[in-house]
């Protein structure tokens, strides 16, 4: 899980994930073109380096199609973080809201 947090800590890598979320299954060249259209100033080598870190963290998976390598967003690690860290805190907040709703309903009776 540390690799996922490390990968998500960089704004450039988050931008790459956003691009893949919007248009999954891109080659390196297609991804670079999409980033350039969005105004991101990243070299092909930088994109390649960031993709390698995202692959290590299992946030991006690749599939070979002939000589091309397609990059896909893998949302599972992010979902696991949400379940482990965010979900735990959200449950208690939802319970507090539910308790407050019941208390207000009793008061209005």
How does the language model describe each region?
Residues 1-4, 109:
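Short, intrinsically disordered or compositionally biased N-terminal tails of bacterial proteins
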Residues 4-7, 11-44, 68-80, 84:
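N-terminal helix-turn-helix DNA-binding core of bacterial DNA-binding proteins
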Residues 18, 22, 79-109:
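Amphipathic alpha-helical dimerization/coiled-coil segments
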Residues 51-52:
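Short, hydrophobic-biased segments on the C-terminal half of alpha helices
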Residues 55-66, 72:
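Beta-hairpin "wing" of winged helix-turn-helix
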């Amino acid at each position: 899980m540390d690799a996922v947090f490390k990968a998500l800590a960089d704004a450039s890598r988050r931008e790459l994930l956003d691009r893949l979320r919007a248009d999954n299954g891109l080659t390196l060249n297609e991804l670079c073109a999409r980033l350039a259209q969005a105004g991101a100033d990243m070299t092909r080598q930088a994109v390649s380096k960031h993709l390698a870190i995202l692959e290590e963290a299992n946030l991006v998976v690749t599939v070979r199609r002939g000589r091309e390598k397609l990059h896909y967003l893998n949302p599972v690690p992010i979902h696991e973080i949400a379940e482990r860290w965010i979900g735990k805190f959200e449950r208690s907040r939802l319970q507090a809201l539910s308790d407050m709703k019941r208390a207000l309903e009793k008061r209005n009776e």
